């Protein structure tokens, strides 16, 4: 197992103007980024980064600073598989040459970090790539973008950083991974930390969900305890249906059967046959009830895989005209899946979950939760409830979104579906 340094050391080094190495989850990019605070950018730091990385230097910024500086997305529909939010590239308008040298890029980076800067201080396009970090940092998205901004903020600096992926010295056509990153960090006296450790550190020191109320909910599957939560970022309310003692027989919160269910008004409430959401919710409650211990976490704000109810209905119109569920979203200028599981992970932690068996047919959901310090020991499939109205939708989820759905090829489609 690769030796990692403390988050405290990384924060101190960032504050002192040094670079650090940050590695993400092996199931995600499994790469290490060189990171330093943008306001501490010097020609020497930039030159060092260019020498040992891919050279595609990016500057993660808080969302409010991106808005203030007029940094629009590079593309209206973000198709990056990890959701990295690239904005238009920039150069400082004054005081630099062509913009590509280490000195020029350092000047642009410092200007991006300056709270007094305005959109008029930059030219577009340029040689520096700003990135928009999610509010809430690694607790919302476990990526290098958010990790770098979090480290800058923890160091008492502006929420602006510089990041780039470290290239392998053994194979220059590949990126360096954990063991080689440890050697690199030691050779250059740099701290090596993981995003998982940063998440754990922040979870110990901060809280981003609030438990508001609890009440018993008798259902056809038995009596659950409904625990209501809100987020400090928005007014969206979530509810966890809890059955039994989550701490378990050993009091450790391990091996909990969990379903993280995305809100679906049309399927869960109206019984729409266009999706399988209602039957999945019912099956999850039934499986937890049979287990006698578990959680069905109902995530509001996930309607239509996160695009909202009105956009979902518009997507249905496009599907009726022949588009599939993925292309319908994309035609509306929306991502195929905009869901964020960070708050759900915090709720599960608050409920005492340490490890779980996750009820899902969607492998991406496992990755979305696994990066938050929750150990998923097993993915438990849910029964597939196919019908003539949802069969095309299910096949698209299987073929284009990687869902583990079997036995779909023998079902006929409804006329016009």
Curated annotation (Swiss-Prot):
Give the reaction(s) catalysed: D-ribulose 5-phosphate = (2S)-2-hydroxy-3-oxobutyl phosphate + formate + H(+); GTP + 4 H2O = 2,5-diamino-6-hydroxy-4-(5-phosphoribosylamino)-pyrimidine + formate + 2 phosphate + 3 H(+)
UniProt-annotated stretches for the region DHBP synthase = 1-204
Question: What biological process terms from GO does the record include?
Answer: riboflavin biosynthetic process
Q: Where does GTP bind?
A: 259-263, 280, 303-305, 325, 360, 365
Per the record, the pathway is: Cofactor biosynthesis; riboflavin biosynthesis; 2-hydroxy-3-oxobutyl phosphate from D-ribulose 5-phosphate: step 1/1; Cofactor biosynthesis; riboflavin biosynthesis; 5-amino-6-(D-ribitylamino)uracil from GTP: step 1/4
- The question of whether Ribonucleoprotein is a record keyword is answered with no
Q: Where does Mg(2+) 2 bind?
A: 29, 144
Q: How is the cofactor bound?
A: Binds 2 divalent metal cations per subunit. Magnesium or manganese. Binds 1 zinc ion per subunit.
User: Any idea which residues are catalytic in this one?
Assistant: 337 (proton acceptor), 339 (nucleophile)
The residues the record assigns to binding Mg(2+) 1 are 29
Q: Which InterPro entries match?
A: DHBP_synth_RibB-like_a/b_dom, DHBP_synthase_RibB, GTP_cyclohydro_II, RibA, RibA-like_sf, Riboflavin_synth_RibBA
List positions binding Zn(2+): 264, 275, 277
User: What is a GO molecular function of this protein?
Assistant: zinc ion binding
Keywords in alphabetical order, please: GTP-binding, Hydrolase, Lyase, Magnesium, Manganese, Metal-binding, Multifunctional enzyme, Nucleotide-binding, Riboflavin biosynthesis, Zinc
Region (GTP cyclohydrolase II) residue spans? 205-417
Name the NCBIfam families for this protein. Answer: PRK00393.1, PRK09311.1, ribA, ribB
Q: What does this protein do?
A: Catalyzes the conversion of D-ribulose 5-phosphate to formate and 3,4-dihydroxy-2-butanone 4-phosphate.
Family under the similarity heading? In the N-terminal section; belongs to the DHBP synthase family.
Q: What is this protein's name? A: Riboflavin biosynthesis protein RibBA
Write down the species: Mycobacteroides abscessus (strain ATCC 19977 / DSM 44196 / CCUG 20993 / CIP 104536 / JCM 13569 / NCTC 13031 / TMC 1543 / L948) (Mycobacterium abscessus)
